[in-house]
Amino acid sequence: MAGVKVTFMMIAALVGSNQARCHRMICKGNDMRKTIVVGLAALMALYFVGGISARHEVFPWPQLSALRKMVVAEKAAAPSRYTFDDKERLIGDESKTPVACPAQTDRTAVLLLLGQSNAANDGGQRHRSNYGARVVNAFDQRCFIAASPLLGSTDTKGEYWTLLGNHLIASGQNDSVILAPLAYSGSEVARWAKGGDLNPVLIDTMKQLQASGHRVTSVLWVQGEADLVIGTTAEAYQQRFMSMVDTLRQHGVEAPVYISIASKCLEPSNGGFKEHVPDNAIVRAQMALSKGGHGIREGVDSDALLDGDDRYDDCHIGGSGAEKVSLAWLDLLSGDRRLESSR
């Protein structure tokens, strides 16, 4: 009996010990859960505060950001031959060949090239002057032998303005061609109107040309795709375009302004639609403007001229498209020159 009693006492002690150990484990488990919950809450609070701090540039984000830059060296930008301004416009290219700007005569074409991506360096084919310094890219009161991409516009791919310059020389219409590009990919007409962020850049470009002794002979406008996508009305487009024309006139540009029929840019990858509707508000506005006087003339109808094979991504102009568009501009400018000469 005594042995049995001792055995029961030992079992009871063991059970008690296990129960105590379990209680301690439960307590530890509860403590751990509390720690996790508190930690998660703290992390969420820090995330929220950090987001507000970063968004509004208030304490402690600027201080932490500065500390990170001191402790961890920022990755240096990869070397490039290109230089861009704060609006991503190409303003430098180490491959350019600087030359003396041609003296302007009555056989010099000075083309101010305005618009969005299909007037900028987004073409599918690069071109260069076939006539050396007779076709130049004017930028910042300097001239360079014309070659894609042109200084003064966004992006670094191809363009067809240099090809147009070659055609103007080859046709005998001009002895020299000065290309003055100012085109911004994706730009709406509102950005070019008075109060828009591109209007002062336009004014500065005109002043640079004038300071170089150059008088613009034609303004070529290729834009409209962005406004179709965002739903700009025909009335609003006309008002904003005329505001830009007023800026040109107020700063001494008396040359004709050619407004292209340009509204087609397909596929969501380009910010466009799946299908194009030719009769749209932007085209109606462009047609009305070209017939409304004020020195505004109808430019190339790229919507109708170019087919699917001429746009390498259903929006931007490829090699065959560049040939078509440059020849169409040649015909327009040559025809108007003959008309003016006959008067």
Descriptions of predicted regions:
Residues 39, 46-343:
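Cell-envelope and extracellular/periplasmic
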Residues 8-12, 36:
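N-terminal compositionally biased, intrinsically disordered segments and leader/signal-like regions
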Residues 4-8, 16-31:
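Short, Lys/Arg-enriched N-terminal segments with co-localized hydrophobic residues
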Residues 27-45:
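N-terminal Sec-pathway targeting helices
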